[in-house]
């Protein structure tokens, strides 16, 4: 969609929340960490809610998003002999995933019966790297939709 907007005077917005849901399923689902002790896999994108827009004003393309993300994890303990204890489910949420967030400002809430510290230590850095790519991918995918025709 190319918009007629002389001199880029008007704000042009595009709702990208549906795209963001697909993005997380395509790019974050099955994110994995594995070492000699653990295998941690993101098994489902449970919820992507909030706002996600790409906008243009005065020729500059920006993205504005404020979302809550919820994911499910599977954790396998490789050294555990007891089959009932060698794997368990966990969840991880990002209560505020926002456009002006710095890398060290990400908050990850982990729900698990066991091994929260290990999930935070090993899996969160892998997930964070993927989440940090979102903003550039969002703009790259939608900038052309909000820029005016010349």
Give the positions of each predicted feature.
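Long protein-protein interaction modules used by eukaryotic assembly/scaffold proteins
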Residues: 1-23, 27, 31-150
């Amino acid at each position: 969609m190319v918009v007629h907007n002389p001199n880029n005077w008007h704000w042009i917005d595009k709702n990208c929340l549906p795209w963001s849901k697909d993005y997380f399923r395509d790019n974050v689902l099955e994110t994995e960490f594995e070492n000699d002790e653990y295998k941690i896999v993101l098994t489902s994108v449970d919820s992507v809610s909030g706002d996600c827009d790409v906008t243009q004003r005065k020729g500059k393309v920006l993205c504005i998003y404020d979302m809550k993300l919820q994911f499910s994890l599977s954790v396998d303990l490789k050294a555990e002999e007891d089959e009932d204890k060698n794997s368990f489910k966990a969840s991880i949420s990002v209560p505020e995933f926002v456009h002006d967030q710095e890398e060290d400002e990400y908050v990850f809430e982990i729900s698990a019966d066991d091994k929260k510290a290990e999930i935070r230590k090993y899996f969160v850095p892998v997930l964070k790297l993927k989440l940090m790519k979102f903003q550039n991918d969002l703009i790259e995918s939608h900038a052309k939709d909000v820029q005016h025709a010349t």
